[in-house]
Design a protein with these regions (language model features):
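Helix C-cap/helix->beta junction micro-motif
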Residues: 28-31, 139, 199-200, 315, ...
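Conserved core segment of the aminotransferase class I/II
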Residues: 227-302, 306, 389-390
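Conserved glycine-rich beta-strand-loop-beta hairpin in the small C-terminal domain of fold type I
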Residues: 284, 299-309, 319-331, 363
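N-terminal small-domain helix-loop-helix segment of the aminotransferase-like
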Residues: 2-103, 110, 288-289, 391-395
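PLP-dependent enzyme catalytic core of the Aspartate aminotransferase-like
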Residues: 82, 86, 163, 335, ...
């Protein structure tokens, strides 16, 4: 059988971090010591029963058995507009300022292709969600990462963008609460980003994947649109995976600047499929859930974070307070790279974590653990790590 070469574009793409982790996990013998996977962010909690009941009823509706519209049902776009008005005080035109798609990855990967020209720069943070770097490659653009660190609360400083990069910027991508560090946005961050956008006439994309998960239930993460005029300069993507525990349902949307939405919708008709009508009906139900139901869904992560942070303190493993998302960003012990430490945990105690280097050079020296593994698994994993006495050596 002949073996054909991949295209130059595919050859130049980085190996997906999570596919690498999946391969590593498959190589571990777990018969005597079951693998505990803390590497990925797939929610372990059930989808709200109201949403499940909604899709069960919608599946039998013959109106959902044909090809769905590329634009999404008018009812789901109106539900999105109502949701944003209720939660963020933002008025949206359902026809021109909203796009729906099969999961937010399509949005954060597709919007760059819709607005960035070859040779331009996509500016984001380093570390960052790896898809932003691959989106630059697929757009034939350059990626410039603003290094963020613990000293800066993992927030970028746009004064650090070189003039050459700023002059040829095609898009700025932000993601707060931040994956992988858990950092929370401040009003000053979004104000600075907007000033940069206006100064250099560059659009903004805010990946609001962890919109519902601040450091506490009172600490509601900021939308980009909390800033005046932000809708004029950017778009915000939203996923149902985290807020509504609907990771397998594949539904997301983008809202904001009409010209960006229009460009993306055109790309969407050539590149992606549409969303099953029954899933759209279920999305309407999810968007209509009362605020207290949403708080119940995310309270699980707040409780887990509190317990895990307490356990980390017992291990003398330093951890930053006030982290959003359902991840914790942890410094590795002295003498290890992030990859070495991740491999040690996998081989010695069968605990899989995400090495910081997988999120960019700025992630070196850290690992990311997920709080979606369940209470017992999380504490059991930390007990296994404690048995290695790695942090006793640093005391």
């Amino acid at each position: 059988m002949p073996e054909f070469r991949a295209s130059q574009l595919v050859d130049e793409l980085e190996e997906n971090l999570f596919s690498v982790l999946e391969k590593l996990a498959s190589q571990v013998n777990t018969e005597d010591l079951p693998l505990i996977d803390l590497s990925s962010g797939s929610p372990d909690q059930p989808t709200p029963p109201e949403v499940v009941a909604s899709v069960q009823a919608a599946i039998t509706d013959s109106k959902n058995h044909g090809y769905p519209s590329f634009w999404g049902k008018p009812q789901v776009r109106q539900a999105i507009a109502d949701f944003y008005l209720r939660h963020y005080g933002v008025e949206l035109d359902p026809d021109t300022e909203i796009a729906v798609f099969q999961g937010s990855l399509i949005g954060v990967g597709g919007i760059p292709r819709a607005v960035v020209n070859p040779g331009q720069y996509i500016i984001s943070t380093d570390p960052c969600y790896p898809i932003y770097r691959s989106a630059a490659r697929q757009s034939q653009a350059h990626f410039f990462g603003l290094v963020v660190s613990e000293e800066s609360q993992f927030l970028p400083d746009f004064a650090d963008v070189p003039d050459e990069v700023a002059r040829h910027a095609g898009l700025v991508i932000l993601n707060y609460p931040h994956n992988p560090t858990g950092a929370l946005a401040t009003p000053e961050l979004f104000a600075d980003a907007l000033q940069f956008a206006q100064r250099h006439n560059v659009p903004l994309l805010h990946d609001f994947a962890y919109a519902a998960i601040g450091s506490t239930h009172e600490d509601v993460p900021l939308s980009l649109f909390s800033q005046p005029d932000a809708k004029e300069w950017g778009v915000e993507t939203y996923t149902f995976s985290k807020t509504f525990n609907m990771a397998g349902w594949r539904f997301g949307f983008a809202v904001g600047n009409a010209s960006i939405i229009k460009a993306f919708k055109k790309l969407h008709t050539h590149s992606y499929s549409t969303v099953f009508g029954a899933i759209q009906d279920a999305a309407i139900t999810a968007l209509s859930l009362p605020d207290e139901r949403l708080q119940q869904l995310v309270a699980v992560y707040h409780q887990r974070r509190k317990r895990v942070v307490q356990k980390l303190a017992e291990l003398r493993w330093p951890v930053r307070e006030s982290q959003g998302t359902f991840f914790l960003w942890l410094a590795v012990p002295a003498g290890f790279s992030s990859q070495q430490f991740a491999e040690l945990l996998l081989q010695e105690v069968h605990v899989l974590v995400a090495p910081g280097i997988g999120f960019g050079k700025g992630g070196e020296g850290y690992i990311r653990i997920s709080l979606t593994a369940g209470d017992a698994a999380l504490l059991h994993a930390l007990d296994r790590i404690a048995a290695l006495h790695l942090f006793d050596r640093q005391a």
